[in-house]
């Protein structure tokens, strides 16, 4: 034994005292073994040596329990027994109790070693040594000495069963050697008039555990909880056993035929698993003082053992957060409580949290005489003159990393430190990003250059050309956006899929572009970005078409609005090289909490003269640029959202170059779907931009995703109706989506056939919002001129239909029809007058009502 203990680096010693009668097993609790925190692969190899005295001769039994995995298994049996009898492995159990504590259990009425005849009565248990080698290779030992020799008396235990004991349907459950059960019972007297005593007995599989009240009885039962301690035969656990008696009946109301109701909770320990699941708990109790027979009443309950993993085995841990600048960080590990300047045996270990390789991740171990071991990467350490241990880490990167550090002194006192190293952000070189709603897809702001930090709320001079303007507002951040991005001035030379986008011809039909400085008090101050070929739907595979308008919101106007397009936002791929652009429209009124109206992006890769960029709105209305090559993102839409299920859209909104006070009135009727009025309004298939008009041109979907019946490769352009109330509605593939796809329409898809490069009107199944008079702002579109007040056409007529007759012929037909109708009316009136004069008196012989009447 002494030789074996020499290999132990740390040893814990204890004295075992067995009390009462032998219950049929010995139980030794072994505390303070190191199970490291935040480590699922931290195992331990455990071996146990049992030291016997047989007639003055020493005998040793070695048990190999193998590897302990505290996160997956709680009960272990020896894999082998050296120096024992044939069935020795069946006589021992090792159980995890939680908090780094083990329990070794051995049957006491069967001999685990081979002895000669006549020596059976001379076998005594002297001591137990437990060897626990952790994942760092450190050997921890526990030496448990018996206070008095404990003799093993092999005998057969008779089967015991108590009669006249009331059975219950309640099962007593044992977890980590602790039994817990609550039983209902009754006493003949009320609480303050009663005393109480109890005794328990657990029987099964040649095990007999008895537990009694330490003070014998509760002399006076009080209302509420009456707590008491109990003592069980065998090993006395360091966790006390006890019980609680609670009165559950009103003080003056007995239960007829049974008396007064009580609740009894019992928690005896240790309860060995050798009892088995067929064992029985007997409870003997009395309400009139202790009885020699054990009590006046008896109830019984079945016992089952749970395989549930007990409470965490991990050592207690102190947590420290360290934020550092640069490449290295240092943490000083102080001495443990019982350590002094002369302690000869000090060990420090360190590993990164949640390791996965026991061969390579546990190399960092230091002693007073050793340096940094080989294989300890990114971690170095050394003892200082004051016995503190300084650990330096390096090369951690930007993500926080957690280091687990332990320090152990000579008497096996151990402290554990959890240190979280976080690198301080370098605000001058990176643009921080954050997901404010939890809906934005990853890489939402990857278009930002990593080495560029752009201040927010920048406004370009009016003469600088295309500029994305921002404004501070109090609207909440819309869902699916990324905050923290900064606006920058776009580059004038964008590229899209390798196709260079030319600057717009200012002499073309595209309106002149101006960039006025935002006016904080103007109700409709806006900034218009130049739109190349803004109104001509070009659907060639390599011909970029994009239209972007970014009006500046007015923080003080109740009708201010912001339309922030999002070119180059990506979704499900629609076309290989067909340039498309989606627009994300936000209402950012100064005091409005209106949800954002978002047009779902569908893999648009449009080239714009203002630069390939993706504008994402945040709580500070900051915007950021994105390059033409970008990973896919997903736009999540809140309420009041119109989604375009397939294809990308080029949406052009023309805003005034100068200050205007004209807005769409919320009381104006919304145009019907498919309206083809040549005057103005949505549904106009003309390529000219009219007041109040929003032209939407579909891109080129692969295999004509917009029209499933069209032949492969066909290009289809479908204008989409947009209401003046601010909702963009689209019917694509026969489905109309509003919000999160809550509404659908069974409108069939029209197959135009042929080369449908000319935009045609599709009749949409559209539901518009009613006019709102509430103070909550709704999204609105701005016009280049006052809104048209003439009546809109209410009958959908295809724009290409031609009249069959001339206007003069139609006029003649109308007058002729009117004359014929008038003549017929006169003839009818004359006939009625003639018949009235010829009428005579009549009497109904069969009255149509209950009483007979004469009608003239």
Swiss-Prot record:
Which segments of the protein form a coiled coil according to its record? none
In biotechnology, this protein is used as follows:
Primary surface antigen capable of inducing and reacting with virus-neutralizing antibodies. Almost all EBV candidate vaccines are based on gp350 proteins.
Q: Which residues lie on this side of the membrane: Virion surface?
A: 1-809
Q: Give yes or no: UniProt keyword Transmembrane.
A: yes
InterPro entries with a match to the protein in the record: GP350_C_dom_herpes, GP350_C_dom_herpes_sf, GP350_N_A_dom_herpes, GP350_N_A_dom_herpes_sf, GP350_N_B_dom_herpes
Residues linked to a glycan? 47, 87, 114, 166, 169, 195, 229, 277, 318, 328, 345, 356, 378, 386, 411, 435, 443, 457, 497, 519, 533, 554, 568, 582, 585, 603, 614, 650, 684, 695, 704, 729, 764, 807
In this chain, the stretch annotated as Disordered covers 421-779
Pfam name, any one? Herpes_gp350_B
Regions of compositional bias (Low complexity) in chain numbering: 427-437, 507-570, 617-631, 654-669, 731-741
Q: Name one GO cellular component term.
A: host cell membrane
Q: Provide the protein name.
A: Envelope glycoprotein GP350
Q: Give the Polar residues compositional bias ranges.
A: 442-488, 575-616, 674-690, 703-730, 743-776
Keyword check for Secreted, yes or no: no
Query: What family classification does the UniProt entry report for this protein?
Result: Belongs to the Epstein-Barr GP350 family.
Q: Which UniProt keywords apply?
A: Glycoprotein, Host membrane, Host-virus interaction, Late protein, Membrane, Transmembrane, Transmembrane helix, Virion
Report quaternary structure and partners. Interacts with host CR2.
Q: Can you tell me where the transmembrane regions are?
A: 810-830
Domain of life, source organism: Viruses
Q: How is it modified after translation?
A: Extensively glycosylated.
Compartments reported by the entry: Virion membrane; Host membrane
């Amino acid at each position: 034994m002494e030789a074996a203990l020499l290999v132990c680096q740390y040893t814990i010693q204890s004295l075992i005292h067995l009390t009462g009668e032998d219950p049929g097993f010995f139980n030794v609790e072994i505390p303070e073994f190191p199970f490291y925190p935040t480590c699922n692969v931290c195992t331990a190899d455990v071996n146990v040596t049992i030291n016997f005295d047989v007639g003055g001769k020493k005998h040793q039994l070695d048990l190999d329990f193998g590897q302990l995995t505290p996160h997956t298994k709680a009960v272990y049996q020896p894999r082998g027994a050296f120096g024992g009898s044939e069935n020795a492995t069946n006589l021992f159990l090792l159980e995890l109790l939680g908090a780094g504590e083990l329990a070794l259990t051995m049957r006491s009425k069967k001999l685990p070693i081979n002895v000669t005849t006549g020596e059976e009565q001379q076998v005594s248990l002297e001591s137990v040594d437990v060897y626990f080698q952790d994942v760092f290779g450190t050997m921890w030992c526990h030496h448990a000495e018996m206070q008095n020799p404990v003799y093993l008396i092999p005998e057969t235990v008779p089967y015991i069963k108590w009669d006249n004991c009331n059975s219950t349907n309640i099962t007593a459950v044992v977890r980590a050697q602790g039994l817990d059960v609550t039983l209902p019972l009754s006493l003949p007297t009320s609480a303050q008039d009663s005393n109480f005593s109890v005794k328990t007995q657990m029987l099964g599989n040649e095990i007999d555990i008895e537990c009694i009240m330490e003070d014998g009885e509760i002399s006076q039962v009080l209302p509420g909880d009456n707590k008491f301690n109990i003592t069980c035969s065998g090993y006395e656990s360091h966790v006390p056993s006890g019980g609680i008696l609670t009165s559950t009946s009103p003080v003056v109301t007995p239960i007829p035929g049974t008396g007064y109701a009580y609740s009894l909770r019992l928690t005896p320990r240790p309860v060995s698993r050798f009892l088995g699941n067929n064992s029985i708990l007997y409870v003997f109790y009395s309400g009139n003082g202790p009885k020699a027979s054990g009590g006046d009443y008896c109830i019984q309950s079945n016992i089952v053992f749970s395989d549930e993993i007990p409470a965490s085995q991990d050592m207690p841990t102190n947590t420290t957060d360290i934020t550092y600048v640069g490449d290295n960080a240092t943490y000083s590990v102080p001495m443990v409580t019982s350590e002094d300047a002369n302690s000869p045996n000090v060990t420090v270990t360190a590993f990164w949290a949640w390791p996965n390789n026991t061969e390579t991740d546990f190399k960092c171990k230091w002693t007073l005489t050793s340096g940094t071991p080989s294989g300890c990467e990114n971690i170095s350490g050394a003892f200082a003159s004051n016995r503190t241990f300084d650990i330096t880490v390096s090369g951690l990167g930007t993500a926080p990393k957690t280091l687990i550090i332990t320090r152990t002194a000579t008497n096996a006192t151990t402290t554990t430190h959890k240190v979280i190293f976080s690198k301080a952000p370098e605000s001058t070189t990176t643009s921080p990003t954050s997901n404010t709603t939890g809906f934005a897809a990853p890489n939402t702001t990857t278009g930002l250059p990593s080495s560029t930090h752009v201040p927010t709320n920048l406004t370009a001079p009016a003469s600088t050309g295309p500029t994305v303007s921002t404004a501070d507002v109090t609207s909440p951040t819309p869902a699916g956006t990324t905050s923290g991005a900064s606006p920058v001035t776009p580059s004038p030379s964008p590229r899209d899929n390798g196709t260079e986008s030319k600057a717009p011809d200012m002499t073309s039909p595209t309106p002149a572009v101006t960039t006025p400085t935002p006016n904080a008090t103007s109700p409709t101050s806006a900034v218009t970005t130049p739109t190349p070929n803004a109104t001509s739907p070009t659907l060639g595979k390599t011909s970029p078409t994009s239209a972007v308008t970014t009006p500046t919101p007015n923080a003080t106007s109740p009708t201010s609005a912001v339309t922030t397009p999002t070119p180059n936002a990506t979704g499900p791929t629609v076309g290989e090289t067909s340039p498309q652009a989606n627009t994300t429209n936000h209402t950012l009124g100064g005091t409005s909490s209106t949800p954002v109206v978002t047009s779902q992006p569908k893999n648009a890769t449009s080239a714009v003269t203002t630069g390939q960029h993706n504008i994402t709105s945040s709580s500070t209305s900051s915007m950021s640029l994105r390059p033409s090559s970008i990973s896919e993102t997903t736009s999540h839409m809140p309420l009041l959202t119109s989604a375009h299920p397939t294809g990308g859209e080029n949406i052009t909104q023309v805003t005034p170059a100068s200050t205007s006070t004209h807005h769409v009135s919320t009381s104006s009727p919304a145009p019907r779907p498919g309206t083809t009025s040549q005057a103005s309004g949505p549904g106009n298939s003309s390529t000219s931009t009219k007041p109040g008009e929003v032209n939407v041109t579909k891109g080129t979907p692969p295999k004509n995703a917009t029209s499933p019946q069209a032949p492969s490769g066909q290009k289809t352009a479908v204008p989409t109706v947009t209401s003046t109330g601010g909702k963009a509605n689209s019917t694509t593939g026969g489905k109309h989506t509003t919000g999160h796809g809550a509404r659908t329409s069974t409108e069939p898809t029209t197959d135009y056939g042929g080369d449908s490069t000319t935009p045609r009107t599709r009749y949409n199944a559209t539901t518009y919002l009613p006019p709102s008079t509430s103070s909550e702002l709704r999204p609105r579109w701005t016009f280049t001129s006052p809104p048209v007040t003439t009546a809109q056409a209410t009958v959908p007529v295809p724009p290409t239909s031609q009249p069959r007759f001339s206007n003069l012929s139609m006029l003649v037909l109308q007058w002729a029809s009117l004359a014929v109708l008038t003549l017929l009316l006169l003839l009818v009136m004359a006939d009625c007058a003639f018949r009235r004069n010829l009428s005579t008196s009549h009497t109904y012989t069969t009255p149509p009502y209950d009483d007979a009447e004469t009608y003239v």
